[in-house]
């Protein structure tokens, strides 16, 4: 039984490491000095003159931190899957929400029902930094500004919900 446990630990570690290996690792610093660790993958075989969609993936609360690795725990391997990469070539950004922060809202809403969500809140510094990161990639000529996808799970889904309410977050500045 002990051997199986050890095998499972090594197997889960190897899956986690393989999810990290295909991603570029970087830290974005905003114009106000706020930093946001993120991972990114590019389309495997980019063709000159072709534009590719951009996918922004927002992770859940359990992956917050500053190690620039935990945000790949759920979903990281899916974007690296060779079949998916060939069939759906895209730029994929996977930022990491800092520990103690919440995607998009200035503070976590007390109710998670859409009708009770706070409306008209000012963007948090994290959201502004995320917007600047997004704008950096939207300025690239290879990115199709008409195909921007924001997806998330759990806390990231709430960030997605909030992000699309800020039209200026999902629309390029230029």
Question: Across the structure, where does each feature detected by a protein language model lie?
Answer:
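Active-site machinery of serine-nucleophile hydrolases
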Residues: 65-125
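A domain-start/cap signature at the N-terminus of enzymes
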Residues: 17-54, 90, 151-158, 166
């Amino acid at each position: 039984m002990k051997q199986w446990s050890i095998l499972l630990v090594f197997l889960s570690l190897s899956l986690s490491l393989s999810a990290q290996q295909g991603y570029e690792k970087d830290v974005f610093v905003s114009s106000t000095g706020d930093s946001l660790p993120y991972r990114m993958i590019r389309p495997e075989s980019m063709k000159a003159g072709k534009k590719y969609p951009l996918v922004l993936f927002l992770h859940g609360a359990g992956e917050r931190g500053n190690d620039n690795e935990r945000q790949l725990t759920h979903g990281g391997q899916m974007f690296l899957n060779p079949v998916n990469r060939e069939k759906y070539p895209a730029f994929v950004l996977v930022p990491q929400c800092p520990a103690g922060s919440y995607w998009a809202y200035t503070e976590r809403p007390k109710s998670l029902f859409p009708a009770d969500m706070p409306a008209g809140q000012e963007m948090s510094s994290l959201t502004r930094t995320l917007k600047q990161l997004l704008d950096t990639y939207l300025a690239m000529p290879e990115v199709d500004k008409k195909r921007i996808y924001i997806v998330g799970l759990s806390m990231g889904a709430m960030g997605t919900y909030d992000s699309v309410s800020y039209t200026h977050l999902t629309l390029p500045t230029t």
